Amino acid sequence: MKKYFYLLAAMFVAVLSTSCLESGLEELDEYSGCDITNGNVYWRYYGDGKNPASGEQEVKQVYLAAARTQDVDNCVYTIRYTTSNIPEAERANFTESKAVVAVTISTAATIKPINGAPKLGVPGDWTKDNQYEVTAADGTKKTWTIVVEPYN
């Protein structure tokens, strides 16, 4: 019983010694960055094997990005891809209308598709330029155009 009393007393002291300071705290700046800083193109396809955990057919993913350019003034991010990483047997099945694009954006920013653009990170139609609204933590917004094209 004595042990429980000491444990309860220790918890009581711990709760009372914490602070509920609500004023005099340093104001921190919110991030104002709303840029696309990196981008990648991937191709996903079904492999021959089975996933041992689920028993489903395995899904393979191949990295395709070869070059990137960022035009901050015009808010255009271009990703050029090469299909040389795709296995020869699968290469004929590649189409931009089912490519997967993933991007990195400024710290604490959010991104959402606009004007019918596909969601990022899942297969989507990249045969056309797509627009995304990037919102910084401080509320600043920019509309970015992502262009996916073959690398020549």
Model-found features: residue ranges?
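C-terminal motif of bacterial Sec signal peptides marking the signal peptidase cleavage site
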Residues: 15-19
